């Protein structure tokens, strides 16, 4: 799954959805509200888009962790994640708080309006190799996904 394509697809879908909703609400053609919608989307999702572009340009494997400070599941997952990362210095951690504007990357990657936190993704050269959401209480789970991700990386 290509990160850049996911972001572009999400933004295109949002643009159509919001344009249609506003057009229906105000009884105007969608083209008439396109400028307002584009401005809103740029302001709202801009930080997440820029972050996705940064991640896309990275050479090594990125482990993306999107959680929330007040999420107990996220907090329980963090020490396990840190332990896993201490054994895998080749990974670059990108840790986001879902409540921040860059945390909207969650929806761009996950593709749904709602879901479970945290979201954990292994991304290599702009390709999302593995993604999972929810509680992760064992380093073996990270290890499993890391190994699958590594196999996929070296095959391509």
Model-based region annotation:
Residues 1-59, 150-156:
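N-terminal leader/targeting and pre-domain segments
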Residues 107-112:
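Charged, often glycine-rich, active-site loop that binds/positions anionic groups
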Residues 3, 113-156:
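Non-catalytic, surface beta->alpha helical segment in thiol-disulfide oxidoreductase systems
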Residues 62-64, 120:
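Hydrophobic beta-strand anchors of alpha/beta hydrolase catalytic cores
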Residues 31, 79, 139-143:
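Generic alpha-helical secondary structure signal
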Residues 64-70, 75, 81-106:
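Thiol-based oxidoreductase modules, predominantly thioredoxin-like and allied folds used
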């Amino acid at each position: 799954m290509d990160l850049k394509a996911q972001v572009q697809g999400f933004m295109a879908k949002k643009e159509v959805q919001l344009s249609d909703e506003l057009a229906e609400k105000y009884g105007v053609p969608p083209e008439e509200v396109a400028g307002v919608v584009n401005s809103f989307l740029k302001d709202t999702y801009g930080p997440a888009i820029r972050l996705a572009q940064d991640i896309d340009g990275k050479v090594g494997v990125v482990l993306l962790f999107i959680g929330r400070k007040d999420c107990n599941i996220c907090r329980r997952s963090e020490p396990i994640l840190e332990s896993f990362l201490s054994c895998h210095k080749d990974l670059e951690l990108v840790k986001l708080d879902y409540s921040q504007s860059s945390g909207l990357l969650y929806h761009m990657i996950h593709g749904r309006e709602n879901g479970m936190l945290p979201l954990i993704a292994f991304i290599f050269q702009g390709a999302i190799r593995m993604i999972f959401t929810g509680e992760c209480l064992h380093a073996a789970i990270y290890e499993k996904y890391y190994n699958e991700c590594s196999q996929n990386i070296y095959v391509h």
